[in-house]
Structures are given as structure tokens and as C-alpha cells.
Amino acid sequence: MFIAIEGIDGAGKTTLARGIGNMLLGEGYRVYMTKEPTDGMENYAGDGVELFLKFTINRYAHQREIDRHIKNGEIVICDRYIRSSYAYQFEGIAEFFGNSEKAWEWMDSVSEIIKIRPDVQIYVDVDEETAMERISRRGLRNPHFENEQKLRSVRQIYKGFQWDLIVDGGRDKEAIISETFEKIIARLRQEKT
């Protein structure tokens, strides 16, 4: 099983991914934790088109690693995946093309090289104010992406996608982890039958 966890910066994706991963390990499952962008790509700068291409190339290589672990019988949990690129780079790409529809078509076309797609896509939703408080506590890392206006627009794009599970990231983290874990376990059991 391949699980992708998405959401704006400060939503609690990493906390949820680690929590679920640890609980699955505790139940005897083999788990591989990964993230995007992969190491060395976090502080890349550029316009929307350039960033989308760079992250897609990074993801193209990363999907081989993910596939290897899936084939090895592990549950792969990825902190961000393809939808993050769509959500974070859409505005810049739409501006480049001067058209939202062309931007979506172009992103879909470029993303055709990504063949490994998540079995379960989880969206951690949190308001921009809460996200900024969390980001401030951990230390601002990328002011281009980690500001309230950008987070608001990215959040709206995320909300437009279909999700297997939407989690309220403003709730108690232990409750969120436990509830999400139970839903994943139920899905794993369902797949076994």
C-alpha cells in the first residue's frame, strides 16, 4: 500500500505520517517512510513552471524507490507527493499560461511520467492562521511558501481535489493519528479479503 499525506505547510503532515508509521510498525507491518521533496530539494527557488519541472524530475526518480519498497511488501507513507506540486505551483503556472485550464492540462501532461500513484490520499486540513503559528514555532524556512496569503491560496487548491480521507489538522494530534490509523487498518484488512 502506498499512502500520500498532503496539506499546507504547518498542517501536521509529518506528525501524522510519523504517528501512523509508528503505529503500523507496532502492529507488525513493515513500513517505509519517505517525503517530498527529497533531500537537497527543499530550498529550491524558481517560478511555478521551473519548480513544477524540478519537483516532477525529483519525483520521477523517487517513484522508483517507492515502487521498490511496495514490491518488497512494505507500506509506503510519503509526506507530500504529486498534489503538493499542483497546489503550490498552480498560481505561477496559470500566470505563465495566462489561463487556468491550460495550467491544469500542462501539469497533467508533465505528470504523465509519474506512474506510481498513491492507493490512499490523505489531506490534512488546517486554517492558515494555525499553520502560521506552527511554522513560527518551528522556525520559518521558506518565506516564499510559508506566508498566510500563499497558504490560503494553496489550501483552496487542495480543497478542490478528491480525497480518500480528509483530516481536521486543528484537532488533538493523538486523536487524529489514532482515527487515521484505524481507517488505514480497516482498509488493509479489507484488501486482504
Swiss-Prot record:
GO terms for cellular component: cytoplasm. SUPFAM superfamilies: P-loop containing nucleoside triphosphate hydrolases (SSF52540). One of its GO terms (biological process) is dTDP biosynthetic process. CDD domains: TMPK. ATP binds at residues 7-14. It is an enzyme of class 2 (transferase). It comes from the Archaea. GO terms for molecular function: ATP binding; dTMP kinase activity. Gene3D superfamilies: P-loop containing nucleotide triphosphate hydrolases. Its EC number is 2.7.4.9. Keywords: ATP-binding, Kinase, Nucleotide biosynthesis, Nucleotide-binding, Transferase. Transmembrane segments: none annotated. It catalyses: dTMP + ATP = dTDP + ADP. InterPro entries: P-loop_NTPase, Thymidylate_kin-like_dom, Thymidylate_kin_CS, Thymidylate_kinase. NCBIfam families: DTMP_kinase. Belongs to the thymidylate kinase family. This is Probable thymidylate kinase. It comes from Thermoplasma acidophilum (strain ATCC 25905 / DSM 1728 / JCM 9062 / NBRC 15155 / AMRC-C165).
